[in-house]
UniProtKB/Swiss-Prot annotation:
This is FAST kinase domain-containing protein 1, mitochondrial. It is found in: Mitochondrion. The gene is Fastkd1. SMART domains: RAP. The RAP domain is essential to regulate MT-ND3 mRNA levels. It comes from Mus musculus. PROSITE patterns: RAP.
């Protein structure tokens, strides 16, 4: 009897009776309609909850939050609820018995409620997960990596262990959703080789993904942003997923995608056009500033004029309710919109002014950049900004922040660099990366040029600092050990520092690693050469050779960058036709995908090189393409839109003059008249000097026309006409009469009649911009202009600046003889 009683007591302790079975309690939790019902069940069953039940409870609580709007979420209320705290306490005891999936799901759910990372439950869950790491399947591993990322453990040994597991298992991973999560989490720890393997695996798995999986595509973009890699094939495929699912994208998703595209410098007119339509459909309550500010930032820069007006009117009404961050977002959007609405700008600035002390240094720089671009002036605001920036500069020891502060200070009126500031900069130089060094050089140059008042006290030290920066820059370039590391330095080089101090060292460094140039980096090297204005035929020949040999691996989006240095520097590689043909062939299947503006730039670059692919030109010069281009121009910044329109005109002119057999019509008369009527025709000192000398040589001002326009609107520095005996003809004596202002002197396509055997002469003074920086080699646009003028019947005399300003031509007589020689073929009249 006693034995039976003891067995009965043991059974009671081991298997206590529960009000509901495990399954029935889970079912009840899943049927709950709000958090309070879940908490009631937890309170009722506290003593009997199993590991499956606590896992279900956390999951159900999180699902409720996911279903709520931003305004409805009550994370704080749930986290601080007594039964939530009880649930956390109970869960700690069940951790060893949990399955891998339950363990990680509980950790994930708890993190969504913003529980502190040092909470005992989170520490216990992470510790247990670490022990089991090797046995986690890919899905569980991906969720766990997200939990670590939420705790900012990107560089932790635990994240490193996850990266190692992914590296070992990569070829067997079949789930792109899980892989995309892992890629984002471990992106800070991967090598270039591992990065390339991840990209290749992602491409292989992409076709297995349901096209509606927007989140997977967005995570792939996040990964590419984190590793700073604009991999066009993946970007393009993600872009198609977004476009197909545009009707399901909300404001937040579109905003994030646009920001990622901007960072990756990926331009998709098709996506922007679809997003513009989707955003315009959204009706948001004007009494909810957070959502409306997001809409203003996303839609404003690409909206049609009437929509922009509505957006600005509404944001003006909300301006006094904006937080510091919302005001910053609105200012950035106004910069993108090029909106100088003074009333709205003053309202936004008043909000910014209240919060200046709370902004990060990089945010202060953005504020100053935007206000400068929008031409906003406020002495009080700029004085406060200056004081704030100087105080931070004198206290900071972080190189990146010092670079930002110096940049911001130099953009303010009357910049002045104190001794303390110079010393602070000097102290951190060895720790600066190349981008920071370049920024310091740019802004030190600005200081030296503008700081006239304090020249005696500061310039000496500033010049010494510039010299140290030059030496450090050269040393960094010389120390690079491979092309990838060199590119990390070169991509930040720009402006005066590149052209005046480091161009020779940069080219020499590229030549050291010339054999490493391949399809993966060819566009980067070419884009850098385009910026240098430096002609190195060895590098350009290598680029052409790689393009021909590896054309099937080159993405069409890279072709413009590859062609550009050849076009700018006016260089034909030995395999010219094969090279240009390979580049054009690479683009042919993408002509419907490439942005209209990109095609215009590509067509023009090829035209400069006297290469006119018929398929490309037929694609561009038709009504459908031009309509798409007009739509794109509406949403682009005005400066870029103007550049594209001007390049289209130049391409149209080149095709009409050099390929008349294509029968492309000339349709830019009105555009050119608007453009050139804006030009006042004011001559600089050198031009005035030549004008006077030409008048003397030709027998009077009536025989020379300054700032003339040719047919098809080429601007000619000076024009004159010689008869068959090389006698100058005054303009009053024939059909061309001089005008008071610049404009058309004849129909743009019909050359005025000249006397028999007379010749029209174009005289051009070519400044330093017309030549390569290292040799007197004429650049592409100047060579094209000469070609066109000769087709139009001109004899072209180009006067290089280095000849005109040489010692041999230092006297007026020498220059007069030079002009006579070129005009009449004789040294003296």
């Amino acid at each position: 009897m006693f034995r039976l009683r003891s067995i009965s007591l043991l059974s009671w302790r081991a298997f206590p009776l529960r009000p509901f079975s495990c399954e029935s309690l889970i079912t009840q939790m899943q049927k709950c309609t709000n958090e309070e019902q879940v908490f009631d069940l937890i309170e009722t069953n506290t003593a009997t909850l199993s590991e499956q039940q606590v896992g279900c409870a956390f999951n159900v609580l999180w699902q409720f939050q996911k279903q709520k709007t931003v305004l409805e979420k009550n994370v704080d209320h749930v986290r601080n609820h007594p039964q939530f705290l009880t649930l956390c306490s109970i869960t700690t005891n069940h951790i060893p018995a949990m399955s891998d999936a339950t363990l990680v799901d509980v950790l994930y759910s708890i993190k969504q409620f913003a529980v502190e990372s040092h909470h005992p439950l989170i520490e216990a869950l992470v510790t247990e997960a670490w022990k089991r790491l090797e046995r986690f399947d890919t899905n569980v591993l991906s969720i766990f990596s997200t939990c670590l990322a939420d705790q900012h453990l990107y560089f932790s040994p635990l994240m490193g262990k996850i990266a190692d597991i992914v590296n070992r298992r990569l070829e067997t991973i079949q789930d792109l959703r899980a892989l995309s999560v892992l890629m984002v989490s471990i992106s800070s720890l991967i090598s270039p080789c591992f990065q390339e393997r991840l990209v290749i695996r992602t491409e292989l798995l992409f076709d297995t993904v349901n096209s509606s999986k927007v989140n997977i595509a967005r995570r792939i973009l996040l990964f590419l942003r984190n590793v700073k890699y604009s991999h066009y094939p993946l970007l393009e495929r993600c872009n198609q997923v977004f476009i197909r699912n545009m009707s399901h994208l909300d404001l937040e998703s579109i905003s994030k995608i646009l920001n990622l595209y901007q960072f990756l410098q990926f331009h998709s007119f098709e996506f922007v056009e679809a997003a513009r339509g989707r955003l315009a459909e959204m009706t948001l309550p004007s009494d909810h500033p957070e959502s409306f500010v997001r809409l203003f930032a996303a839609l404003g820069p690409v909206a049609r004029p009437e929509i922009k007006k509505q957006l600005k009117s509404t944001i003006l009404l909300l301006s006094e309710e904006l937080s510091s961050q919302q005001a910053l977002i609105v200012l950035g959007a106004m910069e993108d919109m090029e909106s100088r609405n003074s009333h709205l700008l003053k309202k936004i600035v008043s909000v910014l002014y209240k919060h200046l002390d709370n902004y990060k240094s990089i945010e202060l720089l953005k504020i100053i950049q935007a206000l400068t671009f929008l031409h906003f002036q406020s002495k009080e605001l700029f004085m406060k900004l200056r004081e704030l920036l100087l105080s931070r500069l004198e206290a900071s020891v972080i190189p990146s922040e010092i670079s930002v502060l110096v940049s911001a200070l130099s953009m303010l009126p009357h910049p002045h660099l104190s001794e303390t500031a110079v010393s602070r900069i000097e102290a951190v130089l060895p720790q600066c990366d190349f981008r920071e060094l370049n920024d310091l050089v740019v802004y030190l140059m600005r200081w030296i040029q503008s700081d006239l008042v304090c020249l005696a006290s500061t310039t000496g030290k500033q010049l010494d600092l510039l010299q140290k920066l030059d030496q450090l820059g050269r040393h960094r370039l010389q120390q690079s050990t491979n092309l990838d590391l060199l590119w990390e330095e070169l991509k930040s080089l720009k402006g005066e520092w590149l052209h005046e101090s480091l161009v020779e060292e940069s080219i020499a460094a590229l030549l050291r690693f010339m054999d490493e140039i391949d399809y993966s980096n060819i566009a980067k090297v070419a884009s850098f050469l385009s910026r240098t204005n430096y002609l190195n035929t060895l590098l350009l020949d290598r680029i052409a050779s790689v393009a021909i040999q590896q054309v099937e691996k080159i993405h069409p989006f890279s072709v413009l960058a590859i062609i550009l240095p050849f076009s700018i520097l006016n260089y034909d590689p030995p395999q010219k036709d094969e090279f240009f043909g390979a580049c054009v062939q690479c683009c042919n299947s993408y002509l419907g995908t490439l942005d209209p503006g990109t095609l215009v730039f590509l067509g023009f670059s090829l035209a400069v090189l006297e290469y006119f692919p018929e398929d490309l030109l037929k694609k561009m010069f038709n009504i459908e393409f031009l309509a798409r281009l007009d739509s794109q121009l509406e949403i682009l910044p005005s400066s870029l839109s103007a550049r594209i329109q001007f390049r289209l005109m130049e391409l149209n002119r080149a095709v009409c003059l050099e390929c008349p057999e294509l029968q492309v019509p000339w349709f830019h008369d009105r555009f050119c008249q608007r453009q050139f009527n804006k030009d006042t025709g004011v001559m600089n000192g050198a031009q005035q000097q030549i004008y006077k000398m030409l008048a003397e040589v030709l027998g009077g001002h009536q025989c020379v026309k300054p700032s003339a326009l040719s047919p098809y609107y080429h601007t000619v520095g000076f024009e004159c006409i010689l008869d068959k005996r090389k006698k100058p003809l005054p303009y009053e004596s024939h059909s061309i009469a001089p005008r008071k202002s610049l404009g058309m002197h004849w129909d743009s396509r019909v050359e005025p009649r000249l006397p028999p055997e007379a010749e029209r002469i174009a005289i051009e003074l070519l400044d330093v911009r017309a030549f390569c920086s290292n040799i007197p080699h004429l650049k592409g646009k100047s060579a094209m202009k000469k070609r066109h003028l000769e087709i139009l019947g001109y004899r072209v005399i180009q006067i290089p600046y280095f000849e005109w300003n040489s010692m041999a031509m230092s006297t007026k007589d020498a220059r007069m003889d030079y002009l006579r020689e070129h005009l009449f073929g004789e040294g003296k009249s």
